[in-house]
UniProtKB/Swiss-Prot annotation:
BP-aspect Gene Ontology terms: isopentenyl diphosphate biosynthetic process, methylerythritol 4-phosphate pathway
EC number: 2.7.7.60
Protein name listed in UniProt: 2-C-methyl-D-erythritol 4-phosphate cytidylyltransferase
Species: Bacteroides fragilis (strain YCH46)
GO molecular function, one term: 2-C-methyl-D-erythritol 4-phosphate cytidylyltransferase activity
Site (Transition state stabilizer): 15, 22
Length: 219
């Protein structure tokens, strides 16, 4: 069975306050995006890796790869207008049948255990996402103010979100709506249940300068 990692990296670094897109920022001298690809290559050296990047960033990425001697085999697809369209472009390069894991390019600290768990369960469950517990108190905003809700009723969603390849391709044939906030929401729109597995708290999404400091501490 074919395994594919589809890495989506379309950020512009606005929240980071940097001219350099966040996926290219270095952690201990190595770009975030390279560390992310390495995590999946470490899990399965034969895995197909597809990187989705805005066309205007692709030459710079190739220059970075040459500069760092980065030789992990991967294909590049053009980023789209939205994340939905970016993933759809990447899916066009998926080889054959199997399972596809879609992962944020700025989550380099996903554990090998989480990757294995998601891909293993997706073979049986067809649609799997990693989640972690909410540890802070949560309040729901109302017209009159706000109210406390039970944090036990909520989970924080991470990536990779892993699906049967055929199912995922059919899901992405749907018309785009703003309610598609992640891949699970696209698949759920077809009436397909999504199975939850345990993620890892270190699997942070690097989007702010503070996140970069945390990332450096995690090495």
């Amino acid at each position: 069975m074919c395994r594919t990692a589809l890495i989506v990296a379309g950020g512009k670094g606005l929240r980071m306050g940097s001219e350099l897109p966040k996926q290219f920022l270095p952690i201990d001298g190595k770009p975030v995006l390279m560390r992310t690809l390495e995590a999946f290559h470490r899990f399965d050296e034969k895995m197909q890796i597809i990187l989705v990047l805005p066309r205007e960033q692709q030459d710079f990425w190739r220059e970075l790869c040459e500069e760092h001697g980065f030789d992990i085999k991967h294909q590049i697809a053009d980023g789209g207008e939205t994340r939905f369209h970016s993933v759809k472009n990447g899916l066009a390069l998926v080889n054959g049948i199997g399972v596809v894991g879609i992962h944020d390019g700025v989550r380099p600290f996903v554990s090998q255990e989480v990757i294995a768990r998601c891909f293993r369960e997706a073979v049986v469950r067809k649609a799997v996402i990693p989640v972690i517990d909410v540890v802070e108190t949560v309040r729901h905003l109302t017209e009159s103010g706000s109210e406390t809700v039970s944090r036990n009723d909520y989970k924080l969603v991470q990536t990779p979100q892993v699906f049967d390849a055929d199912l995922l391709k059919r899901a992405y044939e749907q018309e785009f709506t703003p309610f598609f906030t992640d891949d699970a929401s696209v698949v759920e729109a077809m009436g397909v249940p999504v199975y939850l597995v345990e993620g890892n708290r270190e699997n942070i999404k690097i989007t702010t300068p503070f996140d970069l400091k945390v990332a450096s501490a995690l090495l």
